[in-house]
Amino acid sequence: MAVEKFETALKKLEEVVKKLEGGELPLEDSLKAFEEGVKQAAFCSKKLNEAEKRVELLLKQKDGSFAREEFRLDDE
């Protein structure tokens, strides 16, 4: 299975949402689209969580140098 990119999954999710919001799909097709949307949303969420863990902030020190600090959310 090929590795999917976040941007590709997000585009697929947006397409699914557009189809579902159109309200023209038969029930069975709506269910299939919904399942695909859930799959794409979970993938995007996972990728965002992974990216968040990798974010680092560069903070300028008083001496002009930079120090790395791991990104932390306030609720952690």
Curated annotation (Swiss-Prot):
Q: Does the keyword Nuclease apply?
A: yes
Q: Please give the biological process terms from Gene Ontology that the record holds.
A: DNA catabolic process
Question: Which locations, inside or outside the cell, does it occupy?
Answer: Cytoplasm
Which reaction is the catalytic activity of this chain? Answer: Exonucleolytic cleavage in either 5'- to 3'- or 3'- to 5'-direction to yield nucleoside 5'-phosphates
Is-annotated flag, keyword Hydrolase?
A: yes
One Pfam family in the UniProt entry: Exonuc_VII_S
Q: Which terms in the GO cellular component ontology are assigned? A: cytosol; exodeoxyribonuclease VII complex
Top-level lineage group: Bacteria
Record-level Gene Ontology MF annotations: exodeoxyribonuclease VII activity
**Major subcellular location class:** cytoplasm
EC number(s) reported in the record: 3.1.11.6
Q: Which InterPro entries match?
A: Exonuc_VII_S, Exonuc_VII_ssu_sf
Assembly and partners are described as: Heterooligomer composed of large and small subunits.
Q: Which family does it belong to?
A: Belongs to the XseB family.
Cited PANTHER family: EXODEOXYRIBONUCLEASE 7 SMALL SUBUNIT
- For this entry, the protein name equals Exodeoxyribonuclease 7 small subunit
Organism per entry: Geotalea uraniireducens (strain Rf4) (Geobacter uraniireducens)
